[in-house]
Amino acid sequence: MGELKPQVYKDPRPAEYFVQFHEAARKGVGWTYTLARLVLTIPTILIFRLRSIGVENVPKQGPLVLAPNHFSQMDHFFVGVYLRRKIRFMAKSQLFGPPVLTYIYKHGGVFPVRRGHHDEEAFETVHELLRQGEMLLVYAEGGRSRSRELGQPKPGIGRIALESGVPIVPVAIYGSERVRSWKRMRFPRVTIQFGEPVSFALEQAPSRERQLEVATEIFARVRVMYAELVTRSAARSGHRSPDRGRG
């Protein structure tokens, strides 16, 4: 495989265009969330032989943030299957384009973040939803890893942890690195492991360095769980454990 070229994520559309999606997310999720869950849960479990570990670590009520690693467009489905609580998702703004998908996102609890911009609106939505006692999913790496290795955490999850003080649940997703996209769909076994919640003392206006420090601490927990899942998978298949999850 050749060296991956850096991607340009800056969305040229004005911030005003995305206000509608933030307003919708703050009001609640619509019928599309329930429909997607009803239609996709059983097929997802069966096709990907999905299993979860540690789901009891996810608080049944109160504000919290799930912080998974991210390989596949299917990851949000994998994480949500075994959780009864509804999840609000932060997603890159470029996903809000095709009319049908945009409608589903708008009414399904998904709100955009304009990567490449100083997008305070996204963080305002995060904090408003947490004030409402909601559960959010924010990918610790800030986007999908384009290799089959864990990426590096971005400061965003650290900022949320410090500015909100809510529990952060680290989540390891193993197997979805072979489920790259809808266009290149494969059906490996996928395992989700939920770690114990971790909280941080409130800090006003934490520096970017401090945000990254906390993000790294959170993602270190993801790395440990991911490495354990790699080892378990190798033991089941009788193969030597690959050297993954480092960085």
Language-model-derived ranges and their functions:
Residues 1-32, 121-247:
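Non-catalytic C-terminal accessory region of glycerolipid acyltransferases
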Residues 2-54, 60, 78, 85, ...:
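A transmembrane-helix-recognition feature enriched in membrane-embedded lipid enzymes
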Residues 32, 59-117, 125:
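Catalytic core of membrane glycerolipid acyltransferases/transacylases, capturing the structured
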Residues 48, 116-119, 150:
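A conditional alpha-helix N-cap/helix-loop micro-motif detector
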Residues 52, 89, 110-112, 168, ...:
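Conserved beta-strand scaffold positions in the cores of enzyme catalytic domains, especially
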Residues 56, 118, 174:
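Residue-level "edge-of-site" marker
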